[in-house]
Every structure is written in structure tokens, then in C-alpha cells.
């Protein structure tokens, strides 16, 4: 009999992080995948990070996960998105060499203690007394465990569509998990269908690069991981082109041949990553749509045309591509396709990502209705950690919305569910000033240390970093100027008689350590990385203090009970639609009311104010 503490099913981004987190927790862990050689495959675009997504990668790294380190090893075009905007919404991103990324992930897993890799297919769960106690494999039979983490990605009943052609597959060239999907239905799990897509892969040597504008990498690459000392790979350029009226005409003439518009596809696709057919149908008034030509590797002939996801027949794909500047003679290496797959309604999960109806079964990644490598990896880490802790008899880990984007995502999924693939954006976080990509380690690494999943090397580096920051902050807080002294140095402050520290002055627009060091030379000894952290911290200090108060108020308000006698129809300012929903659901607390679909912060504020006013009036009349 084969016995493990935790079994992970699936070797994509969620599965790899789940396996690593479980094993780092000390649990004897097995990772089951169709192909060990495919572990860590980037199934769609060759990039990691971006707006919102880059925050998740930094958080994964702060918890000692794999994705950030692998991206740094494989990164061939690092760019910090939104560089000109505030630090809270800046998004680190890199193009990655697919082969190098996969190689890095596989190396991490092969070197991980407490982890064994198994090449097989899961076809059923072992359930005893309504609790999951293992899996059944196609070749090796029963694997018993204390917990199971399902990270099936697009493989669960996956169907590929290209025009009128359809076949079962998890991704191009790999078969789907049909048996497991059928077995899940017998456990009365609420399943749905979603869809995603990918563009054709193009031959690099058949593209006319000379006529295209280029997008360069940042001169000073910003890595994802605290452990990365230097970006080693050479940095490459991407090219930019556009669709045109001729492209759009070909798509319109053949729209009936698209699997998406012929009625063959049932599942909804990601709103923020539409197919090119969707773009033309929904935004037909535009004369063109931007396409990024992204190399898939340093020594690879494959180009990923970001922005051209499609399920049109291959002949139509060739025709539309050759209307685009630079692609007049292009050859397709692999056609674009749409893929449909089963997902589980995430409202059936707890915030540990355990299925309520089947204790011992944890779900992570696209099976929970999300889209994207980063979203999957973050869920995988949390699910693997909680699976290991459940087996070890330890307290469960729930990450709050005010602590991390991971917490925002999980709360959104569990509380609100999904009607389309969920993608992370900074706009989803109420407290994004505190949840910056630059302070992910300060927010999460001490917690990860308590949970026992951080290496000694990372913990030492983190402590050294924080020590440098504490020392620099202390220096700045001990240096003062009066308003007259500030004016003498050309600094514009209010002449209110208040002495201001160097730390206070850093909150002023266009202020920097470099400028202050002209008359406070001791500031010149602060290293550049610490300078950046200190300047951001000081810039946000006042706002963060207010946000901390808001977080405390939210936590207090969430515990506020809603009287059963409360008539929501009497609360002015609430929409009639929301009044009807609330009255029907009858939430017992503000925390319950938050979970109602369509509930907004403004509406919550109206309800809280109304309840508090009623309480005051009742107290005054007593």
C-alpha cells in the first residue's frame, strides 16, 4: 500500500507550488502528473507577472514559492509596468524562455525534500466516511493520503476547438482527464464550463522584423525574487504590429466558422483576454488592434502573437495573419485554438481552498474558475500549505484581504463565485496602498516563517534587508530642519514653525534621498535598494496610517450583527435591485452582507450607518 501525507494531482503552476509548499511544510508529498517532462509548462503566453499578477508573483516569492525564482532564471525581457504611476500599481513582468522556465521548475521540485514525482493519471478519489483519503491512479492503483489537492487546469474534461474540429485534450498534444471529471460528478460537486484560448505560434524566420516598431526591455531589470542577485539572461526586444481593416474583413466573412460563434462552445471566456473574433464583433468600429510579437525563447524559432487568440479554422488563421504588417509571408507552427474545460463553483470552498462537501479535498488553479499562471500558482501554494497543515493537525491558514492579493483573490472566489474566468487586477484590492509589490516580503515572509515554509537563506536575507531599512529610517527620523532652514536649502514647506525630519520631508512631491543628501551627507551611505524602499514607505506613511484605521474599522464592522427586524426597503440610497437581493438572503452580519453579488462598499456603508443610527436612537429613548 502506497501512503503519503498529501497527494497533488496536476503538474501545472498550481500543482508545482502546491507540491513545494506541502513538502516544505514537512509533509510526505506525492505529485502526480501525466508527464514529468511537462512539469512547469507555460501552456499559453511566455510571460510571468504584469498588473496585479506581478503582485501575486512577489507574494508567492515572499512565501518562498517557486514562480518568482524560475521567472528570474528564465526572464528574457524584464519590464516594470506602470513605472510612471504610483508604486502601489506598478507591475513587474518578464517574457520568459519557456524551456528555461520549465527546466528551473523541474530542478526545484527534483531537489525538494519530502517530495516524490509520479507519472500517472488520476481517475478517481478514494472517499471514506465522506472524507477524501487518497486517489486511484490509472497504472499504479490506489494512493492513500491524509489530503488531496486537485490542480487539473484545463485538463478536466478538456475539449480543443479549431473551426469545426473538436477533440478531447488538456492542451495541444496532451489528453484530457475525462474519467476524473465523470467521477467528480458522482460526489454531487457543482461543476460548470469555462473557455480560454491561445493564438497561433509563428515561425520567427518568416517575419519581416525590419518594418516593425520594437519594444525594449528595461535597462535595469527588476527581479521578482529576493533571492535573485542578478538577472543572467540576455534581454531581447519584442515587436509591435496591428490588425487592419483587411484583417477585420476576413474575420467578419468567416465568423460563422469560428468555434466561438458557431455555437460549439458553451463556456464563457476571460473578459480581459478576448479572442480576436470577439474584438472585431464587440469593437468593430476600431481600425486596428495592437499585436505584440513575443519570442518564446533565446534559441527558439517560435513567436507568440499576443492579442490574436482565436478558434477560427487554420486556413482562415493563415489568411488573416498575412494581412498584418510584417506577417505577409508568415508560416504557422501551431494553429491557435480555444479550449473548454470543467471547473468547480468556488463558492463550495472554504477560504483554505478545501471543498466543504468533501473534507480532505483541496482545489487550486483553473479548476476554481481563475485564469492565469500567477493566480493558479498563488492558490496552489495556499492549498498545498493548508493540506499539509490539516494532515499535521495544525491550525488552518486564511490570508485576509488586508494582508495580500492572495487573500483578495480567495475571498472573491469563495464569497462571490465566478461567471467568467477570474483575473487579478490591482483595482480588486480595497487596501492596495498597503499591498504593494515592493513590500510583499514585509507583509508575508514573517508569517511564512511562523508557518515553517521559509528556507534559512531567505529568512537571513529578509532580516538583513529589514535591518538596513530600519537603520536608514532611524537615521532619517533623527535629522531635522526648521521651515527657515528648509527654505535656505531650497525646500518648499509651510512656515508653521514645525521642525520636520528627513523622513517627513520624503513624503513631499519630488523629494528624494539624493536631494536631501546634498546637505545631510550621512544619507549617502544608504544603499540604492534601501533608498527605494524607504522613499516609497515615507511617501505613503500618512495614507498607510489612515488605511490601517480603515482596516481596523472594516474588521470591526464585519462583526456587526444585522437585526432580523431590519427593513432594508427603508434605507435610502440602496438600489431597488440590491434591496430585493438583501431582503431575500437576509444576511445576519455585515460580513455576510459583503458576500452578496452586487454589494458595493458604498452600500455597506449605508447599511452600517443605518444600523448604528438605529442603535443610538434606541439607546437615547431608553
UniProtKB/Swiss-Prot annotation:
List, separated by semicolons, the cofactors it needs. Answer: FAD
* Superkingdom of this protein's organism: Bacteria
Pfam families attached to this UniProt entry: GIDA, GIDA_C_1st, SAM_GIDA_C
Q: Which SMART domains match?
A: GIDA_assoc_3
Q: What's an example GO BP annotation here?
A: tRNA methylation
Q: What is its main location?
A: cytoplasm
Instruction: State what protein this is by name.
Output: tRNA uridine 5-carboxymethylaminomethyl modification enzyme MnmG
Entry GO MF terms? flavin adenine dinucleotide binding
Does the UniProt entry include the keyword Cytoplasm? yes
Q: Which residues are listed for FAD binding in this entry?
A: 10-15
Instruction: Provide the Gene Ontology terms for cellular component.
Output: cytosol
Q: Which UniProt keywords apply?
A: Cytoplasm, FAD, Flavoprotein, NAD, tRNA processing
Give the source species: Bartonella quintana (strain Toulouse) (Rochalimaea quintana)
- Membrane-spanning ranges: none
From which lineage does this chain's organism come? Bacteria, Pseudomonadati, Pseudomonadota, Alphaproteobacteria, Hyphomicrobiales
